[in-house]
Amino acid sequence: GFLDVVHVGKAVGKAALNAVNDLVN
């Protein structure tokens, strides 16, 4: 459902932010 898509989107966003954080630090 729509909420599942939102949940997956948030998870992907967090993973991307963490990856960028690791590269910066």
Curated annotation (Swiss-Prot):
Residues recorded with modification Asparagine amide: N25
Cell compartments where the protein resides: Secreted
Domain of life: Eukaryota
Keywords of this entry: Amidation, Amphibian defense peptide, Antimicrobial, Secreted
Membrane-traversing stretches: none
GO BP term, pick one: defense response
Tissue specificity: Expressed by the skin glands.
Secreted is among the record's keywords: yes
GO CC terms, sorted: extracellular region
Family to which the UniProt record says this protein belongs: Belongs to the frog skin active peptide (FSAP) family. Cruzioseptin subfamily.
Function according to Swiss-Prot or TrEMBL: Has antimicrobial activity.
Protein name: Cruzioseptin-13
